[in-house]
């Protein structure tokens, strides 16, 4: 087709650009344009720039083509700015605007400023965005509805509600997009009452405004009102459904999440992702894999978030065979996913499923190891009885200049508990509070209680619970009761059990543990009394279950 292009029309060029598969093709088209003496045709060059701005290297090539035009007009400048703005390249976009102003040969117009504000808002560049706003006021484009809306959107995304409302109030003309931008601004700042008020005042609502308010209610945890608004929507799209699916999943209601997923039409990768992640996060790994299989059967290509959810499900199951299958699947397609998200999850999955050699290899190959990857390796080591190695890795992490946070200390304290390393655990507990000024959380205290309980230091564990600056949660008391069962201490066990009966009145676990302690001491009357109490309260022991991989 390139060879037959003797005198290209704009239409034939657009068709030709769509067929381009590589930068080599673009070079061939450009060479043909030069040979035909059409390099100064600004309409033609604008199409070339728009079509060749798909990657950073292509953008660089577009810029070189632009440079060959002696006096580019505003239309051509806008196409170049659009290419960089669509890639969210802040410095390059603003630099082109400044250069355009300096030349004096072309003036920015109502199409220029929204492109620049898009990249300013995405990068949170409040100062530069405000300066551009001042430029708009001087030039006189502030009355344009598209320009005004872009500033409402900008200030809203930067959480400057005063400026967003001020720009909106001064706009002589507003459309549905302008109103939606202000609704979104209030939603992003957590001002849901104000968002609802603006939504109610809208003369004409569009799908974006409905979706923004539904999503805001979902993210605030108000699923009841979110569903009520969702049901009132005159029209819904996959964004509407995905917000609700994600909300139900985060709230633990996977039945409602699945029902909405089945109801939605044209589900895309985001909806599949919300459902798979929901099952994984709610401890239903088999369902997560089942949905993934359904997705693959429909030829939907997974993104990195889906793969992270799948690996989380695999980690929960601890299934070596499934781990190998997921790892192999990713290994063949790694270039399609962001390693920033995928590799730490891949390390975590392999470590927790017992594939420590593979986890270690991935860990060592990381160009820059972070806190998440270190924690994944330490957890895996602890699960498989390598507590001392996990501690050495923690020390290596600190030596490399990575500062441990409260999650990292939770991990290392769990490591010490699982490996019964009392001195090390107590040392890290003090180090966390004194050197790193991290306030001990209920989870941190629970880890120490577990460590002391496992090693028979039951009185120390009990005294620690009583000295906590907050009410101990059930996991701390449960760890101590488990220690009492392990070491046969009835006196402390009875005190601990009473606390657990109050905290978790419908949990059979505490009754069963105390019953086992009595049984080990042949106190069958007490065993019978406990079972009668369970029956009176309608408490039943949940039968154990095993994972079976197919």
Swiss-Prot record:
Listed GO MF terms: RNA binding
Region span, Type E motif: 476-550
Keywords linked to the UniProt accession: Repeat
Pfam families: E_motif (PF20431), PPR (PF01535), PPR_2 (PF13041)
Stretches forming PPR repeats: 73-107, 109-143, 144-174, 175-205, 206-240, 241-267, 268-302, 303-333, 339-369, 370-404, 405-435, 441-475
Gene Ontology terms describing biological process: RNA modification
Highest taxon above the source species: Eukaryota
InterPro entries named among the record's database cross-references: E_motif, Pentatricopeptide_rpt, PPR_At4g14850-like_plant, TPR-like_helical_dom_sf
Keyword Repeat recorded: yes
Family (UniProt): Belongs to the PPR family. PCMP-E subfamily.
Protein name: Putative pentatricopeptide repeat-containing protein At5g37570
Gene: PCMP-E37
């Amino acid at each position: 087709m390139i060879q037959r292009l003797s005198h290209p029309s704009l239409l034939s060029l657009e068709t030709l650009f769509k067929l381009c598969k590589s930068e080599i093709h673009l070079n061939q088209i450009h060479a043909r344009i030069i040979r035909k003496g059409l390099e100064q045709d600004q309409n033609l060059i604008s199409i070339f720039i728009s079509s060749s701005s798909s990657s950073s290297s292509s953008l660089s090539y577009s810029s070189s083509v632009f440079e060959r035009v002696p006096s580019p007009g505003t239309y051509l400048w806008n196409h170049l700015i659009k290419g960089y703005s669509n890639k969210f390249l802040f410095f390059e976009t603003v630099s082109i605007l400044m250069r355009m102003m300096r030349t004096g040969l072309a003036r920015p117009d109502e199409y220029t400023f929204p492109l620049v504000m898009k990249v300013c808002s995405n990068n949170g560049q409040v100062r530069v965005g405000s300066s551009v706003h001042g430029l708009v006021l001087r030039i006189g484009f502030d009355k344009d509805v598209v320009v005004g809306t872009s500033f409402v959107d900008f200030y809203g995304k930067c959480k400057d509600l005063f400026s967003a409302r001020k720009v909106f109030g001064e706009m002589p003309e507003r459309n549905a997009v302008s109103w939606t931008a202000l609704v979104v601004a209030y939603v992003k700042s957590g001002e849901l009452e104000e968002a609802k008020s603006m939504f109610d005042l809208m003369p004409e609502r569009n799908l974006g405004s409905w979706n923004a308010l539904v999503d805001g209610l979902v993210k605030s945890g108000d699923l009841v009102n979110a569903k009520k608004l969702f049901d009132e929507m005159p029209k819904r799209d996959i964004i509407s459904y995905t917000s609700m699916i994600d909300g139900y999943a985060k709230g633990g209601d996977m039945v409602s999440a699945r029902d909405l997923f089945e109801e939605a039409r044209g589900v895309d990768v985001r909806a599949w992702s919300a459902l798979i992640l929901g099952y994984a996060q709610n401890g239903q790994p088999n369902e997560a894999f089942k949905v993934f299989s359904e997705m693959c059967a429909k030829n939907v290509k997974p993104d990195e978030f889906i793969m992270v959810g799948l690996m989380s499900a695999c980690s929960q199951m601890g299934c070596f065979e499934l781990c190998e299958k997921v790892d192999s699947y990713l290994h063949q397609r790694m270039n399609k996913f962001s390693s920033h998200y995928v590799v730490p999850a891949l390390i975590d999955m392999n470590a927790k499923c017992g594939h420590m050699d593979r986890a270690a290899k991935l860990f060592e190959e990381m160009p820059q190891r972070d806190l998440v990857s270190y924690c994944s390796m330490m957890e895996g080591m602890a699960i498989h009885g390598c507590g001392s190695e996990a501690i050495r890795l923690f020390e290596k992490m600190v030596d490399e200049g990575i500062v441990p946070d409260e999650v990292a200390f939770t991990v290392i304290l769990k490591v010490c508990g699982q490996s019964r390393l009392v001195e090390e655990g107590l040392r890290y507990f003090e180090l966390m509070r004194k050197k790193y000024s991290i306030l001990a959380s209920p989870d941190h205290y629970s880890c120490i209680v577990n460590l002391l309980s496992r090693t028979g230091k039951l009185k120390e564990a009990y005294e620690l619970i009583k000295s906590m600056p907050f009410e101990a949660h059930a996991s701390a008391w449960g760890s101590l009761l488990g220690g009492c069962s392990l070491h046969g201490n009835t006196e402390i066990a009875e005190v601990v059990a009473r606390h657990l009966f109050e905290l978790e009145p419908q949990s059979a676990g505490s009754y069963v543990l105390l019953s086992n302690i009595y049984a080990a001491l042949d106190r069958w009357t007490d065993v019978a009394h406990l079972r009668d109490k369970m029956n009176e309260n309608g408490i039943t022991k949940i039968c154990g279950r095993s994972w079976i991989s197919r």
